[in-house]
């Protein structure tokens, strides 16, 4: 057993990213990204604002189309795995006119309520099932969004800074919850985050994107559960931060977003 593969069922999707490129007009945002992500691995993607990390996640989610390169789930196109993929954003995106359990079961047909309650129980909110979203805190709303993803039994979970707006304590609690559920279910995770300490605390591997390219690919070979504030975690965090801070600090342009309609399967 290694730090990268805790004892759990590995049912995640293996990903291959080959020479991935994305251009918006005259601006090249991604410049030949190459990655291999084994099934069930937890990968954190960090980098300065505008470096291309959110664009990478959007391409994996099918929200934008690459200009060049390949996205594969195993040996098949990643588009074949869309039903097994879920995306969580920084905002929970709950429908305020639907009760919590109905938000979890959004879009489902048949007898889904028992599954929705089970998903809410997994995130500690089964007792709030019949309340309205307005009654929840920000962290609780993100738990509901996570339950909405879990009910579909995803094999690939994409997280676009879902904890960015939470207070420090709630953020740590959500990190621990996501880590526990990942260990239980074995899905592949890609987390985009600005928080390097978060990345090294919960990921198997930290990818640093620099100006649209992979600048650092760092394995986090530490046993779980990890001790926050430990010397070894601090050393890894410093290694990543030193690389980020060694780059020129010019104000970046925001990453473009394609205006074209897409087939979005967010945490729904």
Curated annotation (Swiss-Prot):
Signal peptide: none
Disulfide bond sites: none
Residues the record lists as binding ATP: 47-54
Catalyses which reaction(s): ATP + H2O + aliphatic sulfonate-[sulfonate-binding protein]Side 1 = ADP + phosphate + aliphatic sulfonateSide 2 + [sulfonate-binding protein]Side 1
Main location: membrane
Annotated membrane topology: Peripheral membrane protein
EC numbers for this chain: 7.6.2.14
Subcellular compartments: Cell inner membrane
Domain of life (superkingdom): Bacteria
Alphabetized Gene3D superfamilies for the sequence: P-loop containing nucleotide triphosphate hydrolases (3.40.50.300)
Family: Belongs to the ABC transporter superfamily. Aliphatic sulfonates importer (TC 3.A.1.17.2) family.
Quaternary context: The complex is composed of two ATP-binding proteins (SsuB), two transmembrane proteins (SsuC) and a solute-binding protein (SsuA).
Name of the featured protein: Aliphatic sulfonates import ATP-binding protein SsuB
Species of the source: Pseudomonas fluorescens (strain Pf0-1)
Gene name of the record: ssuB
């Amino acid at each position: 057993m290694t730090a990268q593969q805790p004892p759990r069922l590995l049912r995640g999707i293996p990903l291959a990213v080959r020479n991935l490129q994305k251009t918006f007009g005259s601006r090249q945002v991604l410049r030949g990204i190459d990655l291999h992500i084994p099934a069930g691995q937890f990968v954190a993607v960090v980098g300065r604002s505008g470096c291309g990390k959110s664009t990478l996640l959007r391409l994996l989610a099918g929200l934008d189309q690459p200009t060049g390169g390949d996205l594969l789930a195993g040996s098949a196109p990643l588009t074949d795995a869309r039903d097994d993929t879920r995306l969580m954003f920084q905002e929970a995106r709950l429908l305020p006119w639907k009760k919590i359990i109905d938000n979890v079961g959004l879009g489902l047909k048949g007898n889904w309520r028992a599954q929705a309650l089970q998903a809410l129980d997994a995130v500690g909110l089964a007792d709030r099932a019949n309340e309205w979203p307005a009654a929840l805190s920000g962290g609780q709303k993100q738990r509901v969004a996570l339950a909405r993803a879990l009910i579909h039994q995803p094999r690939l979970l994409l997280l676009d800074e879902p904890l960015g707006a939470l207070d420090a304590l709630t953020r740590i609690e959500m990190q621990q919850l996501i880590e526990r559920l990942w260990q239980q279910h074995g899905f592949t995770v890609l987390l985009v985050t600005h928080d390097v300490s978060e990345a090294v605390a919960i990921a198997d591997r930290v990818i640093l994107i620099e100006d649209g390219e992979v600048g650092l690919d760092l394995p986090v070979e530490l046993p779980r559960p990890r001790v926050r504030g430990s010397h070894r975690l601090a050393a890894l965090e410093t290694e990543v931060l030193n690389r980020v801070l060694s780059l020129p600090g010019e104000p970046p342009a925001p990453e473009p977003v394609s205006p074209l309609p897409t087939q979005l399967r967010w945490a729904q």
